[in-house]
Amino acid sequence: TLHRPSNVDEREVLDPIIRFLLDEVSKDLSIIWPIHPRTQKQLKTFGLWEELLAHPQMILLHPIGYHEMLRLNMDAQVMLTDSGGLQEECCVLGTPCLTLRWNTERPITLEENGGASILVGNNISRIREEYQNTLQKDRKPVRPELWDGATAKRCLEAILSY
């Protein structure tokens, strides 16, 4: 998914990302892309929309619900996104995540902190390098230490021991 102005508002930034998806990622994988309305608008403005629609490996979806997105995330080989929420979900589900941002408000999701996400910004060389590295890795859940599903139990134990 892409929706942040830093990725979609300037053709000079968006076009190389689209070229990477169409020319490189599509050789390895089908691309399923729920399109944010403002992203769709920009793709049309820049004359890229019809090319995406016509590409045989590109499946464009209208915005989808939470459960549908979770299902896609669970089945994904890799997630390319600029969404903070998807960074977290990738960690929980074990989906490798390339975050097309230069920073994140969710640093615990980053690979160096035990998460599944790598910040790649919108630099195509960096995106390409990390994408190729990701395809070589064994997929396994990578979760931060306390993201084990036992938070309620720990809270209850803390309350009872007080």
Model-derived segments and spans:
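Conserved C-terminal portion of the radical SAM core fold
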Residues: 36
